[in-house]
Amino acid sequence: MRLNPAKCTFAVEAGKFLGFMLTQRVIEANPDKCQAILNMKSPTCIKEVQQLNGRLAALSRFLAGAAIKSLPFYATLRKGKQFEWTTECEQAFQDFKEFLGRPPILSRPQEREPLILYLAVGSRAIASALVREDENVQQPVYFISKALQGSELNYQKIEKFSYTLILTSR
């Protein structure tokens, strides 16, 4: 294996790694990726909505319930439907921009530390949040969310909870 010395850093306190900002204690969203969304104007075509969804997917581990909040965007992508950027889409877009104005921070769990798992199940999306408790303050470790599609929409509530657990455990 050959390493490129220009791309290597050793014994650093913090830095960018695989698109994330890592420190000894926390993982932060890459400010460049957050800024890309903050600089976006409201989408005017399907291609721009797809681009927005891709950028949000890259930050999804930092966004609680990202799929649930993105449902208005998915509605604009339905085949056979004329593109329409609704007020609901605009509100969701502005909410994401407001949230990303303060880059999200995830806590790093300690070895053998108990973690808390929260599950959320809706009619069209599911989500989970893994958190740790530090001095009676809950700090997020990881977020997962998924928009349900096809036959998944017909699952019973208990099946959706089971599916959320399976998705989270992967």
Annotate the PLM regions.
Residues 1-2, 132-139:
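Secondary-structure transition/capping motifs at alpha-helix termini
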Residues 1, 6-113:
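C-terminal reverse transcriptase regions that engage the nucleic-acid substrate
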Residues 44, 100, 121-123, 147:
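Short, flexible loop/turn elements at secondary-structure junctions
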Residues 17, 114, 125, 139-140:
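Conserved catalytic motifs of the protein kinase core domain
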Residues 122-132:
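Acidic, metal-ligating active-site segments
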Residues 136-163, 167:
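A short, polar/acidic, helix/strand-boundary loop motif
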Residues 113-121, 165:
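Two-metal-ion RNase H-like nuclease active-site motif
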Residues 94, 126, 162-166:
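Feature representing long, continuous alpha-helical segments
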